[in-house]
Amino acid sequence: MNSPASLSGESISESHGHVLVPGELDLSHGVALYLEDINVSFDGFKAINHLSLSIDAGELRCIIGPNGAGKTTMMDVITGKTRPDSGTAFFGQTMDLTRMREPEIAHAGIGRKFQKPTVFEQHSVFDNLELALKTNKGIWSSLFSRLSGEQSDRIDELLELIRLQDLRDRPAGLLAHGQKQWLEIGMLLAQEPKLLLLDEPVAGMTDAETERTAELFVSLAGKHSLVVVEHDMEFVNSIARKVTVLHEGSVLAEGGMSDVQNDPRVIEVYLGR
């Protein structure tokens, strides 16, 4: 299988060993993320073993698998935190993730949310979104620049999207757990990512919060590509058209939720039935 760059005949430019992020993400072939034959070892342990998968532009994909299956390491490779021993990782057609650093990958349009929410608890919901919106301008600009009308409108849109418009002035530290998760998702969205990586986003949520989160993710698909790592099978079933099952660092099965649930290999190693 040819990588996106070889298919398009394009490459990432370099300058003195420093990778230059292309100005525009190329999704012309309809693929947002492309991993092929990725391998990662830690002290002899094979965390990722010949892993290959692709995520279409605008797709909402759920990743499931037992502990130690390689889910976190896979996201570390995508975000540049971990360098693979071998393999290919492309964002769109031209961005070779294996040759980019973490800040470059984030700037290129890949946003990651960890399981535990990290918000500025002493600041209001609105201020958290404002800081996220200005983050690319540098710390001094973020602290002292005034919001433009367009930026204020964008924050209002985000507040409505994450359903926190009535709590805009509340300190983030006083929010419920689920509300903090939504706020952090809003902060990610403020940076206009094309690909969102979401690690167990509904862990610790109430049933009502989980349902709201499902609605949010479904509404984001299309404009954004989403990769959701989750253990809550009911939640996965409510949002996923396609599920990838990881086991021992490789793709064990892939398809619709019903197909995956009835796959004998998945039943044996993961679902326990």
Over which residues does each language-model region extend?
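Glycine-rich phosphate-binding loops of nucleotide-dependent enzymes
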Residues: 7-273
